[in-house]
Amino acid sequence: MSSEARMFTISDTTMKEIDRFRLRLKKSVMYAFILKVDKATKEIVPDGEIMDLQSIEEVADELSETNPRFILVSYPTKTTDGRLSTPLFMIYWRPSATPNDLSMIYASAKVWFQDVSQVHKVFEARDSEDITSEAVDEFLH
């Protein structure tokens, strides 16, 4: 068992919410599910959900400039051959102004959370201006 598995926890309720998020039926709409690490308990807990996004930039507008977050994103896009694809990826939001103790907590939790949430692609952002449709499209293709 890795040290991260002993250090961090995630409740069954939160895992069910992540599964529900992953299995949404409406794949043509962008959604974001925001999670945070409770500093005291080291539990990963929900911090909000943004539904029916018009653009990924709306996610950036919701983020704090001092608090890191894990954001699961269901992102409808067209493949090079024109088919609709809805990849699930994670934005690892770690703003430059984050206190060092929080930076270390989130850095330690990142790979563990990526594994338990079964997300294979991670887009790292330190500035809200990094989260753009162009940057995400380039990242996913």
UniProtKB/Swiss-Prot annotation:
Record domain ADF-H: where: 6-141
Record-level GO cellular component terms: actin cortical patch; cortical actin cytoskeleton; cytosol; nucleus
The protein's role, per its UniProt record: Actin depolymerizing factor involved in the control of the disassembly of actin patches. Binds and suppresses the arp2/3 complex functions such as the promotion of actin polymerisation and branching filaments.
Entry keyword annotation includes Kinase: no
Family assignment from sequence similarity: Belongs to the actin-binding proteins ADF family. GMF subfamily.
Subcellular location: Cytoplasm; Nucleus; Cytoplasm, Cytoskeleton, Actin patch
Keyword DNA-binding: no
Record keywords, A-Z: Cytoplasm, Cytoskeleton, Nucleus
SMART domains: ADF (SM00102)
Gene3D superfamilies per record: Severin
Assembly and interaction partners: Associates with the arp2/3 complex.
UniProt organism field: Schizosaccharomyces pombe (strain 972 / ATCC 24843)
UniProt cross-references to InterPro entries, sorted A to Z: ADF-H (IPR002108), ADF-H/Gelsolin-like_dom_sf (IPR029006), GMF (IPR011171)
Any single GO BP term: negative regulation of Arp2/3 complex-mediated actin nucleation
GO MF annotation terms: actin binding; Arp2/3 complex binding
Name under which the protein is recorded: Actin-depolymerizing factor gmf1
